[in-house]
Amino acid sequence: MSRYHTFTAADAVEYARQFGQVADPQALVTADEIGDGNLNLVFKIRDTAGISRVIVKQALPYVRCVGESWPLTLDRARIEAETLLTHSQFCPQHTVKVLHHDAELAVMVQEDLSDHHIWRHELIQGNYYPQAAEQLGEYLAQTLFHTSDFYQSAQAKKAAVSRYTNPELCQITEDLFFTDPYIDHERNNFDPVLLPEVLSLRQDKALKLAVASLKHRFLSQAEALLHGDIHSGSIFVADGRLKTIDAEFGFYGPIGFDIGTALGNLLLNYCGLPGLAGPRDAAAGREQRLKDVQTVWQTFAARFLALSQEKAQDPALATEGYAAQFLQHVWRDAIGYCGSELIRRTIGLAHVADLDSIDDEEMRRACQRHALSLGRALILVAPHVDDVGGVVARIRQSPSSLTPQRC
């Protein structure tokens, strides 16, 4: 008989007392539920002084806003905890610390990050963290290299691919990224004024062929243990620090997906800035986002290449020049997935505040159109792209379009 039951606030406090690793467990007295609560229950556990000490997170067996007609596997809580633990093994400085997890209860206890801020909110407010892009690139390199064939033995990786198989959460990604935006689907959500742009995407045969290729790689290429949902809302920042959270979409997939999703969220902010700030601040912020895109990729690529030279275990993959060749393939994937993120966050089910929080209706629509055109252009140009500098230069020169020529 399963021990699973949905936690109350009192349950969360008691659980934190047992597994929160605090010096005085009885000082933990209250729990505040945070988040929207549609997929998970998340509690901040506070002590007698009102200070948040740890986080208790429990997976729900269905999407609460829909009900039991949309069930979800509780095993995603195990996958999330183990993904975070694995990533923490190789990059502890940029991964939230898991203090305890219980697969049967679908619950885990995490360190409290109240002294950090959600990166998306900070980007929207115009608050700049100069270390964040480099630290994100470091996180991506460390976690993706050490869970790839470059470092893991073939036997260990095959076992890990099986252990991290995550079909229900992957199905959500497959639908929301690669299917829904290009068909008439009830999950899609967009301003009716954007219908001409939406219809243009649906009728673009070259675009749909490119998206089909991206989806096929997502389905079939088990290159490394991905975070699976690495956007600016799942990243916390503070002065000199960065931590990733929310890895329930973790699975073995194409390395470029994590990188492209991260870059896509920087470019969503780039597209939204004209509606979020005055002209001078928006221009400066947009230039900084492009520099951030360069920094994330360049840090990732340099570190991944260095790690492959130092630590590659397989003699064939350690062949001089192969890692650099492989990174070209990752880069092209990343640009395609980046474009997919721009499109799906604009007209699909799950939007971002970088665009939706723009008050001026006409400006919001203009920024959304820019995100759609840039997303389409990136997907189409991806097979012809050689380096990040070329892409960034073309975005600067032609803010709303790219042409599929070699960069």
Curated annotation (Swiss-Prot):
Substrate binds at residues 229, 344. Keywords: Amino-acid biosynthesis, ATP-binding, Kinase, Methionine biosynthesis, Nucleotide-binding, Transferase. Belongs to the methylthioribose kinase family. Its EC number is 2.7.1.100. It is an enzyme of class 2 (transferase). Catalyzes the phosphorylation of methylthioribose into methylthioribose-1-phosphate. InterPro entries: Aminoglycoside_PTrfase, Kinase-like_dom_sf, Methylthioribose_kinase. This is Methylthioribose kinase. NCBIfam families: MTRK. One of its GO terms (biological process) is L-methionine salvage from methylthioadenosine. It catalyses: 5-(methylsulfanyl)-D-ribose + ATP = 5-(methylsulfanyl)-alpha-D-ribose 1-phosphate + ADP + H(+). It comes from Yersinia pseudotuberculosis serotype O:1b (strain IP 31758). Homodimer. ATP binds at residues 40, 57, 111-113, 246-248. Pathway: Amino-acid biosynthesis; L-methionine biosynthesis via salvage pathway; S-methyl-5-thio-alpha-D-ribose 1-phosphate from S-methyl-5'-thioadenosine (hydrolase route): step 2/2. Coiled coil: none annotated. GO terms for molecular function: ATP binding; S-methyl-5-thioribose kinase activity. The gene is mtnK.
